[in-house]
């Protein structure tokens, strides 16, 4: 989903309480800006903030419902999809100042449960388990994210002027640390670093034996 485009759902009562709480926690304000043409290259600071609000609000809801339905973050099939969605929300939380010392999703979830609990009572009946999973996953991935950010910065510092980021490092982050490749691409885009995505695909195929 492209959260740089305008989606009217984000102006509904479903997201308003979550956005208000997110604003209180982060000190940032959601203004509903949409990047011109829907492009996410070279976003202004406010555009980055607004995209982060939309990603977090949507992903919190998706992950919470999945856990309530018994599909928890994991390494297999649907579980892996849930984990990647959760991790993407955590990554965008960094834009708003959240970190291992300032967790995000478990703090926001009670607002979602209160807002949607009447229509979806499982959000309240399974609140303890949902919070437990969110807290554990966020703690684990924040540590992974910190390591990944450090490695990206170290590799960046060794690049020649205008040089491409090494595809081997992207694969290492994924293979060794479980760092999603699309998230590494996001970090590189933020730093205006080039990467040969076809080379990464080739290396991943070798790793998988395909």
Residue ranges and their predicted role:
Residues 1-210:
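A glycine- and charged-residue-rich anion-binding loop/surface
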